[in-house]
Structure formats: structure tokens, C-alpha cells
Amino acid sequence: GATLTDSAKLLGIFKETQNLTAQQAENLLISTTELAVANNVAPDKILADVAQNTEFFAKFAEDGGENILRAAVQAKKLGLELTDIEKITSGLLDFQNSLNAEIEASVLLGRNINLQKARELALANDVEGATAAVVEQLGSAEEFNKLNAIQRQKLADLAGLEVSALSKIVNKEKEALTLSSALSKQQVDIIP
């Protein structure tokens, strides 16, 4: 779980990478805890996850880091970590490999897969939206369970994840899409 060290580290990250005042950073930490509780996710797990992914936070954070904190909640609801969300986002921004994976998956699955929206969202640092856009393309748990090993691997490659992580996502897809919608309505206020 989160320790005082994690909290102190996060306060420093918020101030250094997002140019927040000490009070704004503290408010962001409090709001993140409230967001986690509101979504039935252990706040200490969210704070620890973000504290362990400082490079990802520095690279993709916007609006004081609110987008990454919401993505951390989304990840936990999917049974994932921020490192998985980073793999998805970074994979989308590797345009050549992302397009190749998209074409291969489309051929192997016999259906059109289009990650253009997900790539655009990732490029705009909308980590949460990019993840939701990828989830929308994966198909249902029922469809996933009918796939053979090669098809499952190609779908995992498409998402930039291991098959086990992908399996968690498709089994929680409805929850993920509902969560993404709910999170977009919840705001994390960083300014008192």
C-alpha cells in the first residue's frame, strides 16, 4: 500500500512536474484519495501505483496530473497497473508497429479493428480515453474466449499487453466502459 514515503514522493512529483503549489499538490492527493474511494478502489494502491510510475506521470500528465490519476483508478478497476496503461499508450504512439498490429489482428480475427481514435487520444495525452478506445476494439469476453492462442496473442500484441492482462480487460469490459464514462464526469479539483 501507500506509505508516507509514497505520499511525500507524490507531493514532490506533483510540485516538480506540474508546477503546483504545495497546497495544490496536497489537494490533488486528497482528491485522488476521494476519487479512489468513490470508485471502490483502495486509495493506497492508487497512490503507490502512481509513485512507482513517475516517468509515465512526467511524460503524459496534464491538468496537474489529473488524467494520470484517473487512469490509475481505471487501471485498478480493470485489474491492471499503470505500467500496463503505459504499455498501451506507448504502443499506440509507436505508429508503424501499431498499424501493423492492427492489420494483422484484423486479418486473423476476420473483423475490422481501427485504433485511429485511440492513437489520436494517446497523442493528445488522453491516457484514459486512449485506453477506453482500445478496450472498445477488443470485443466481448464471449468473443475472446472463442479465439485460439494465436488470435489471442495478436489481440494482446495490438493492445501492447500480455494475454493474461488482456483477459482481465475483456472480462471487465462493460465495467471499464461504464467506469470511463463515470470517471469523465468526476473531476479532481486541485485548486482550493
What does each of the following model-derived ranges do?
Residues 1-192:
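Amphipathic alpha-helical assembly segments
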